[in-house]
């Protein structure tokens, strides 16, 4: 009993005193809403912008300021200062294309000196620049053409630009290679010159090569050609060496030679019209999503008789509109989704099987020597009006023809025989299958 009385006394002492709620002035009742000192539009922020000490108008929290240092953009500087700074402190990643000051060249200026001193050159829109001497480029070069015209007044065979691998190109973002953009290379009918001889990786973007150029681009160290237009040139592009060349979204029109490549080449989304030899591949390559068309066989340059030589002229064969030279070490070029109209495709001796998947051969001829015809696979190919010819020598009859290397050779005449047993038996294989389906059609 004494223990129970002690517990009751302990509970009485630990309990809180009862609350006494009195309704009166300044006391909120259950049914009243507390009045706000400020309205919704006048509500104060939990912090002030002045407390953050922001460097600009962006809302940057203090945590980000501790982890990241905001660097304000600097103005453009001369190329010579960037070059001198790199020589002193070494390559850095703080300079980009927009950091280099642009020099606006005028007609009559010495372009070779301007390129060496400023590297980033802008030409006047629509102006005509007379090139009276060869321009040698030894270092960085980025020319913004603005549709300016470069007209050559040079002897036959002289190059307008010669790019040499002499000086070191500074570490500037998006200026790592030589760039020619939006330039119209004009060649008068009296002088056949070379537009550019490059021994460095070069980019030609949206340029036009008009006139009877002896050779538009002589690529010796790799290049990328995109969005360019070649009209009436003797040879549009020639590539040799161990470096690859890439051609995209370009047009070749009325050229004696389009692309002559002895190295690895890639051609995509381009058009070749009325070229005596659209493509001549001596090595590996890829041709995809391109259009080859011949509209006449009597006008220049389609009436030219051309040839190509192998083994320093020991083996000479007539040149086709699309020509794959013999190379026992290289496989056939990848040939996908192309359209050929009135074109002659010549195939030399190579490894593997040639499969022009998803390609259209309209009124075309595929010519190949003995033993190569059996390696042509026409599955999933539109070949209703395509003929396959097997070539053989006709005897001692020969004609002199112009070679891809600029020389002339006596080319033997060839005898052709039709081959008809390379097609699939359509009485057994249906066309209502996935044979002509491509996964790329899902993206269209």
Curated annotation (Swiss-Prot):
GO cellular component: host cell cytoplasm; host cell nucleus
Phosphoserine found at: 438-439
GO BP annotation list: symbiont-mediated perturbation of host apoptosis; symbiont-mediated perturbation of host ubiquitin-like protein modification
Keywords: Early protein, Host cytoplasm, Host nucleus, Host-virus interaction, Modulation of host cell apoptosis by virus, Phosphoprotein
InterPro entries (UniProt xref): Adeno_E1B_55kDa, Pectin_lyase_fold/virulence
One Pfam family it belongs to: Adeno_E1B_55K
Main localisation: host cell
Subcellular location(s) per record: Host nucleus; Host cytoplasm
Record comment regarding domains: Contains a PML interaction motif that allows the subnuclear PML localization.
Family note: Belongs to the adenoviridae E1B 55 kDa protein family.
The protein's role, per its UniProt record: Plays a major role to prevent cellular inhibition of viral genome replication. Assembles an SCF-like E3 ubiquitin ligase complex based on the cellular proteins ELOB, ELOC, CUL5 and RBX1, in cooperation with viral E4orf6. This viral RING-type ligase ubiquitinates cellular substrates and targets them to proteasomal degradation: TP53/p53, LIG4, MRE11-RAD50-NBS1 (MRN) complex, ITGA3, DAXX and BLM. E1B-55K probably acts as the substrate-specific adapter of the SCF-like E3 ubiquitin ligase complex.
Listed name of the protein: E1B 55 kDa protein
UniProt organism field: Canine adenovirus serotype 1 (strain CLL)
Lineage: Viruses, Varidnaviria, Bamfordvirae, Preplasmiviricota, Tectiliviricetes
